[in-house]
Swiss-Prot record:
Catalytic activity reported: a quinone + NADH + 5 H(+)(in) = a quinol + NAD(+) + 4 H(+)(out)
Record's GO cellular component terms: plasma membrane
Record membrane topology: Multi-pass membrane protein
GO molecular function: NADH dehydrogenase (ubiquinone) activity; ubiquinone binding
Protein's GO biological process: ATP synthesis coupled electron transport; electron transport coupled proton transport
Ranges annotated as spanning the membrane: 1-21, 30-50, 86-106, 115-134, 139-156, 174-194, 222-242, 252-272, 286-306, 314-331, 341-363, 374-394, 420-440, 459-479
Source taxon at top rank: Bacteria
Protein name, UniProt field: NADH-quinone oxidoreductase subunit M
Pfam families recorded: Proton_antipo_M (PF00361)
Organism for this UniProt entry: Buchnera aphidicola subsp. Schizaphis graminum (strain Sg)
Subcellular location: Cell membrane
Keyword Cell membrane in record: yes
Subunit structure, interactors included: Composed of 13 different subunits. Subunits NuoA, H, J, K, L, M, N constitute the membrane sector of the complex.
Amino acid sequence: MLLSLLVIIPFLSGIFSFFSFRFQKNIPRWIALTGMGLTLLTVIRIWFFEDYYTYQIQSYTHLSYQLILPWISSFGIQFHIAVDGFSIVMLFLTLFLGIIAILCSWNEIKKNEGFFYLNIMLVLMGTIGVFIAFDLFLFFFFWEIILIPMYFLISLWNQKKEDKKKCINIANKFFIYTQISGLIMLASILLLVLNYYINNKILTFNYDLLLIQPVDKSIEYIIMLGFFLAFIIKMPIVPFHGWLADFHERSPYCGAVDIIGALLKTAPYGLLRYNKMLFPNATEQFAPIAIFLGFLSMFYGAWVAFSQVNIKRLIAYSSISHMGLMLIAIYGGNEISFQGLIIQILSNSISTSALFILSGQIYKYLKTQDISEMGGLWTNIYWIPGFSLFFALSNLGIPGTGNFIGEFLILFGIFKEHPLVSIISTIGIIFSSIYSLNMIQKIYYGLSKHDFPKFFLNIKEFWISIVLIFALIFLGLIPQKILNISFESIHFIYNFSKRIQ
């Protein structure tokens, strides 16, 4: 029953937020925040008191804490949700940044507050569902349900209100990209289910059953490629990145926190959970191509980020660059790099979200996202420059932060398998220092281009920034706390993915 609360609470919180707006416009945000808090307490309850570590590898039953209810029995579809250490970590990230996103929007949303928080809660519910669904139809359901509320967030609460038509066009682009991703995934899931039916005469979407059924080599590569394309479009990886920068440029900052912090991380989760485990042979054959795409994203994202004049687009392209490293970790590394990937997902999500939050404060102060209009702000703005410098340095992997630990483990794990790949990846990481420090120099140093009054960081954003700083330092100094949670899951995923047939 506890597991079902992970999706029930956000859903009901969104519904209550929507209807409560009719009574008092401040009620929806309190309901949304309470819903996130209760969901987080539920995850903590599962983490402390339930046994999700037990693995029975001999029978391939790797999940001990799960809920299975009949749903569409005639097609073998169940409401099957479960957690392991990997899921627990991703749930903590989603809920932590979900609370941050709600707090960031606290006084920023001036219209349709009830509908806004409904969409935020549906995005978070869908993201949570992706991390706990172990029926492939249910996984697809949650994967797709995120699309609709994200469409409304960009089209109705865009950052630049004067250009409504362009925002709708950008929302349409996002819709098309993600819809293509969903259709490819659905076709691949159906082929996988058909393969199981041909061999066992049973229709099922159960992940555990599909996991132990070898896929015919004649179609394994095709199905794997379908899953891969669906995930890298959402990640996104070059050349399927066209929607991300436009989306972030026009999205509300709380929406950017959601999508960068949690939503994009559903893709590397899916690659590890599904591609690596369901299609070991095809994944092994495809690894060189995936690594090449990772390199392409790393270097392209870094170079384009360096040339950006819009602060939100710069941060978006930096995210693409980091996603390239994550893809290389998945396809070119080992168990060590997988553990590094977990830390990198957490740290990159936090540092990038923090940069978005601070850029929102700069926009509130200057009414522009154009870096060329900035300069010399260090003496005009209190706290923001120092915080921005910390998060920029964290993003490029300064020691003492979680980003450093994640990158170190990833590169160390890759080096054991492919030394040359690790060396090239290191060069790619160096480029992140160029665009990060260039951004800081252009915004906060040099001569001021305008006569700006003194500006103080909002007290709410100040404490949010402090919390995010402590989170990154915690991951940098005590990463073992997280690695212990995810170890059993990652160990199982790595060993199971090595069963080359």
